[in-house]
C-alpha cells in the first residue's frame, strides 16, 4: 500500500473515531399503502430499533385512511419495540376539536412526543386557518407534550423571505416547541449558516439536521425541486453515469451522508434525524460505520 493511501486510511479512521460514541440518531418512517410495503416497514423498524434511536417518527397523510395507519403504526412501534414513537400531526385538514381529540388519544396511549406541522395546502386553497405555531399552542393546552417542529435551512418554498421563515420558526418555539428538525439538505454550510441565524434570532432550541441517504438520485432531485433544496454540482457529478448501477449509487449516497455527519459533528452537532424512506439498509450501514451499533 502506498504512503498516500495509508495516510488516507489513517485520516478516515481518525475522523470516524472522533464521531464514534458522540452522536445520537432518530429515524423517520411513513405509513405503508400495501401489505408488502407494511412488511418492509416492520422489517426496517425491527432492524433500526436495535440501534437504540432517541425516537422514531411516522409521517401523517392527508386522508383519513393514512392518518389511521399513522396512529396504528405509532402504537405498534411503542408496543413492539418500547421506543419513543413520535407521530406527525398536521392541522391543515382538521378542526381544533378534532386535533384535541387526536392529541388526547395519543396522550392516553402513552405517546408523549409529537411532530407538529401545518401540512401541505390543497391546490387552490386560500390562507390556512391554523399554522404550526397554533398547533403547538393547542397541543400544550391539551397536555405537556414534547413537541418537535420543522425548520428549513434553505427556506420553505412558500415563505416570503428567509427572514419571514425564520420568524415563523421562532413563533413555533415561543409557542412551546422543544426542538426543530430540518428539511433534508446536502450543502452543510446552509445548515451551519441557518443555525447561526437561529441563535441570532433568539431561537434557543436544538436544530436537528435531517439527513436523507440517497440511493436514487433522480428521486432525490425530484424531492429537492419540490422543497427548495439545492443539490450541489459536485453531488450531481458523483451520481453521473450511475442510472443503471443501484449498488454503486448506494455506496456513493452512504459516503455523502457519512461525510455530512462527520463535518456537522465537528461543528458540535450531536443529534441526527434520518429520512429512511422505510428502508433500513443504508441508514443502518451509515450508523454502523459512524459507531452507532447494537449494544453500544
From Swiss-Prot:
FAD binds at residues 60, 62, 88, 118-120, 132, 152, 156, 159, 165, 168, 171-172. It holds the Pfam family MTHFR. It is an enzyme of class 1 (oxidoreductase). NADH binds at residues 59, 183. It catalyses: (6S)-5-methyl-5,6,7,8-tetrahydrofolate + NAD(+) = (6R)-5,10-methylene-5,6,7,8-tetrahydrofolate + NADH + H(+). Its cofactor is FAD. One of its GO terms (molecular function) is methylenetetrahydrofolate reductase (NADH) activity. Optimum pH is 6.3-6.4. InterPro entries: FAD-linked_oxidoreductase-like, Mehydrof_redctse-like, MTHF_reductase_bac. Induction: Repressed by methionine. GO terms for cellular component: cytosol; protein-containing complex. The keyword Cytoplasm does not apply. It comes from the Bacteria. Its EC number is 1.5.1.54. Pathway: One-carbon metabolism; tetrahydrofolate interconversion; Amino-acid biosynthesis; L-methionine biosynthesis via de novo pathway. (6S)-5-methyl-5,6,7,8-tetrahydrofolate binds at residues 120, 183, 219, 279. GO terms for biological process: methionine biosynthetic process; tetrahydrofolate interconversion. The active site is at 28 (proton donor/acceptor). Keywords: Amino-acid biosynthesis, FAD, Flavoprotein, Methionine biosynthesis, NAD, Oxidoreductase. Catalyzes the NADH-dependent reduction of 5,10-methylenetetrahydrofolate to 5-methyltetrahydrofolate. Is required to provide the methyl group necessary for methionine synthetase to convert homocysteine to methionine; the methyl group is given by 5-methyltetrahydrofolate. Can also use NADPH as the reductant, but much less effectively than NADH. Homotetramer. PANTHER family: METHYLENETETRAHYDROFOLATE REDUCTASE (PTHR45754), METHYLENETETRAHYDROFOLATE REDUCTASE (NADPH) (PTHR45754:SF3). Belongs to the methylenetetrahydrofolate reductase family. The reaction proceeds via a ping-pong reaction mechanism, and the two chemically and structurally distinct substrates can therefore occupy overlapping binding sites. This is 5,10-methylenetetrahydrofolate reductase. It comes from Escherichia coli (strain K12).
Amino acid at each position: 500500500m502506498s504512503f498516500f493511501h495509508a495516510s488516507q486510511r489513517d485520516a478516515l479512521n481518525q475522523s470516524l473515531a472522533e464521531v464514534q460514541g458522540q452522536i445520537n440518531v432518530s429515524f423517520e418512517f411513513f405509513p405503508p399503502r400495501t401489505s408488502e410495503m407494511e412488511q418492509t416497514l416492520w422489517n426496517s423498524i425491527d432492524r433500526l430499533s436495535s440501534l437504540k434511536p432517541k425516537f422514531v417518527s411516522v409521517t401523517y397523510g392527508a386522508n383519513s385512511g393514512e392518518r389511521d395507519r399513522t396512529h396504528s403504526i405509532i402504537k405498534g412501534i411503542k408496543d413492539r419495540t418500547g421506543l419513543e414513537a413520535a407521530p406527525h400531526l398536521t392541522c391543515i385538514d382538521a378542526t381544533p376539536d378534532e386535533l384535541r381529540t387526536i392529541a388526547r388519544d395519543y396522550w392516553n396511549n402513552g405517546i408523549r412526543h409529537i411532530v407538529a406541522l401545518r401540512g401541505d395546502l390543497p391546490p387552490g386553497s386560500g390562507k390556512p386557518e391554523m399554522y404550526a405555531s397554533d398547533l403547538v399552542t393547542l397541543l400544550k393546552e391539551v397536555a405537556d407534550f414534547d413537541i418537535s417542529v420543522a425548520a428549513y435551512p434553505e427556506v420553505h418554498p412558500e415563505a416570503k423571505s428567509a427572514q419571514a421563515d425564520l420568524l415563523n420558526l421562532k413563533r413555533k418555539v415561543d409557542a412551546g416547541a422543544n426542538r426543530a428538525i430540518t428539511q433534508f439538505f446536502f450543502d452543510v454550510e446552509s445548515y451551519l449558516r441557518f443555525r447561526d441565524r437561529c441563535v441570532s434570532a433568539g431561537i434557543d432550541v436544538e436544530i436537528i439536521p435531517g439527513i436523507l441517504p440517497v440511493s436514487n438520485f433522480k428521486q432525490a432531485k425530484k424531492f429537492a425541486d419540490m422543497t427548495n433544496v439545492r443539490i450541489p454540482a459536485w453531488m450531481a457529478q458523483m451520481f453521473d453515469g450511475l442510472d443503471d448501477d443501484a449498488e454503486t449509487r448506494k455506496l456513493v449516497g452512504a459516503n455523502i451522508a457519512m461525510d455530512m455527519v462527520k463535518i456537522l459533528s465537528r461543528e458540535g452537532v450531536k443529534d441526527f434525524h434520518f429520512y429512511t424512506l422505510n428502508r433500513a439498509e443504508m441508514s443502518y450501514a451509515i450508523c454502523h460505520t459512524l459507531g452507532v451499533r447494537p449494544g453500544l
